[in-house]
Amino acid sequence: MPGGFILAIDEGTTSARAIIYNQDLEVLGIGQYDFPQHYPSPGYVEHNPDEIWNAQMLAIKEAMKKAKIESRQVAGIGVTNQRETTILWDAISGKPIYNAIVWQDRRTSNITDWLKENYFGMIKDKTGLIPDPYFSGSKIKWILDNLPNVRSKAEKGEIKFGTIDTYLIWKLTNGKIHVTDYSNASRTMLFNINKLEWDREILELLKIPESILPEVRPSSDIYGYTEVLGSSIPISGDAGDQQAALFGQVAYDMGEVKSTYGTGSFILMNIGSNPIFSENLLTTIAWGLESKRVTYALEGSIFITGAAVQWFRDGLRAIDASDDIEPLAASVPDTGGVYFVPAFVGLGAPYWDPYARGLIIGITRGTTKAHIARAILESIAYQNRDVIEIMEKESGTKINILKVDGGGAKDNLLMQFQADILGIRVVRPKVMETASMGVAMLAGLAINYWNSLNELKQKWTVDKEFIPSINKEERERRYNAWKEAVKRSLGWEKSLGSK
């Protein structure tokens, strides 16, 4: 078993981070550098790949400095990343030919509307995804269609495509390795998750040459070596951030579920070695530990959770800092009958209504901002239940424990209400850096830094467990009222347009 430490590279939507772990999965040092978002037109969201790379290198140096280690002490590197974000670069010079098109970018909606209308079933059956600008496929097509000479260069093999993990590994290996893992490939809308290969029919449909795509490898594997830090270090782990978080929550068994509470919420359920195709949820690859053998997941995305707290802070100016919401909400015993539906941009799973709009209902003369604060926190828990109920139904598996992470999971009031409204235990781990920890685990397994999943399970520790404290009748009464509130928000924008 090698000694030393594992370096986890965690490249997010607004910052590049690096975290150093030891064999007990303790965090020894964290580096973080923000980089700007670029909005050249309405609906466009871009990053400059050079800014990402520079921020990432600074974050690595900062983490190593804080951990008081040198590059020769790094046993392996894992890379986790914001998913779907798309970069095309020149295969010879390594220079990006355009900015990275970010997962939030909506410019390709005309392409995906056409796919939805004509090829919805085929794409869902092959990729587990629904045609949406969110995924990489339509972004690649847009660059090939809109930049002069790029398509002809791509057809000659002079262009490379990658999600952020692929680009960083390419840069770390000085252009020697062009690779991604199963989890990231499954977010492109180009990867057949049944056959575990790039899908030629979809590639032909979008006119994307297969030669630009990376090799797809297991999430725990030695892809190559980097020398940019001063020593030769294996790059041995790669996974998209939400899948890495599921792995970091040691959710290795079928039916285990985690929810990440961020700006939105991502709920993933391990569904084992056979995909389940759902009407309301995405089917995705969680990870692959061996070639041609993967673990699948069901994924539900909630658009607005933590963002509702930001709106309460910045839009209403009701609090000075996001952390102020918990004590304010705790100053009242309940919401006083107030329900808040945060449909600022429509509703995601399981409603899928882009015309829904936000509402606050149940206000009386006695309602205070504390009641609204509490209703905002409770709306996060209700939305999680909406998705978890669908997961149970479509997987045929009863969920008994919800593992939680992300900024919102630090809020004890919210986590207690989450347990109350689900009627199950909610478990928060000691180390909340679950995405970076997950990819550190994947990197360590590939180089025998750790020997087994069982060993990793032993090292994972719980910070706090939340047990349901209300009875079933009360739980269902509140949840039914939530569903009634949601019903009143549905189709609002459309109903205005018809008048």
From Swiss-Prot:
The EC number(s) this enzyme carries: 2.7.1.30
Gene Ontology terms: cellular component: cytosol
Known catalytic reactions: glycerol + ATP = sn-glycerol 3-phosphate + ADP + H(+)
Family (UniProt): Belongs to the FGGY kinase family.
Enzyme class, broadest EC rank: transferase
Record's keyword terms, sorted: ATP-binding, Glycerol metabolism, Kinase, Nucleotide-binding, Transferase
Parts forming coiled coils: none
Biological pathway: Polyol metabolism; glycerol degradation via glycerol kinase pathway; sn-glycerol 3-phosphate from glycerol: step 1/1
Residues where ADP binds: 13, 17, 263, 306, 407
HAMAP family: Glycerol_kin
SUPFAM superfamilies noted in UniProt: Actin-like ATPase domain
Name under which the protein is recorded: Glycerol kinase 2
Pfam families per UniProt: FGGY_C, FGGY_N
CDD domains: FGGY_EcGK_like (cd07786)
Gene Ontology biological-process annotations: glycerol catabolic process; glycerol metabolic process; glycerol-3-phosphate metabolic process
Function per UniProt: Key enzyme in the regulation of glycerol uptake and metabolism. Catalyzes the phosphorylation of glycerol to yield sn-glycerol 3-phosphate.
Chain positions recorded as glycerol binding sites: 83-84, 134, 241-242
The gene coding this protein: glpK2
Superkingdom of origin: Archaea
Claim: Mitochondrion is one of the keywords in the record: no
Residue sites binding sn-glycerol 3-phosphate per the record: 13, 83-84, 134, 241
Positions that bind ATP: 13-15, 263, 306, 310, 407
GO molecular function: ATP binding; glycerol kinase activity
Keyword Mitochondrion among record annotations: no
